[in-house]
């Protein structure tokens, strides 16, 4: 238990988290975004760093079929990424992308932490995950631009209403001087 605590405690450092990450090398990720049925455990494949947020890593959840990344265009993927799974049309695959924020103490570890009995207990199909990772690695030219386009698009539109602008972020220098008068 002490080694586990020390490992998790060390992950509060962004540098320690970054030391665990190698693009296109699968790793174990524990997250509340994974369901209790999955024991909150996921095997993910780091695809790329976020184009606008240097603290965010774009990963593919290998539990889900990544074929959708290879077949659909960026606009469709972006729309589907923010659609709840139960609201997807029958036959539509969910987009298996997720962000890991390295400045929020994420729990990540190399695949070597999973023993054979752990893989069985957690119902992890490692050969399937390895095959999916290999397929994505071989098809980088197909999904790379799409993934960047999905996350490069403006996600935040500032409001024109002055009262709502209070929630848009920091007040501009001109407005701050007016407030101080």
Locate predicted features.
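DEDD superfamily 3′-5′ metal-dependent exonuclease/proofreading module
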Residues: 1-181
């Amino acid at each position: 238990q002490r080694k586990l605590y020390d490992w998790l405690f060390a992950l509060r450092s962004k540098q320690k988290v970054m030391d665990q990450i190698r693009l296109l090398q699968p790793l174990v990720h524990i997250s509340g975004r994974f369901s209790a049925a999955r024991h909150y455990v996921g095997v993910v494949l780091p695809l790329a760093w976020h184009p606008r947020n240097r603290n965010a890593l774009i990963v593919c959840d290998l539990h889900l079929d990544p074929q959708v990344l290879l077949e659909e265009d960026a606009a469709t993927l972006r729309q589907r990424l923010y659609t709840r799974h139960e609201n997807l049309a029958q036959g539509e695959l969910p987009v298996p992308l997720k962000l890991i924020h390295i400045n929020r103490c994420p729990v990540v570890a190399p695949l070597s932490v999973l023993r054979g009995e752990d893989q069985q207990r957690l119902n992890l199909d490692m050969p399937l995950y390895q095959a999916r990772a290999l397929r994505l690695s071989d098809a980088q030219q197909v999904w790379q631009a799409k993934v960047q386009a999905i996350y490069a698009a403006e996600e935040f539109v500032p409001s024109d209403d002055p009262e709502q602008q209070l929630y848009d972020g920091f007040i501009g220098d001109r407005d701050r001087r007016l407030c101080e008068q």
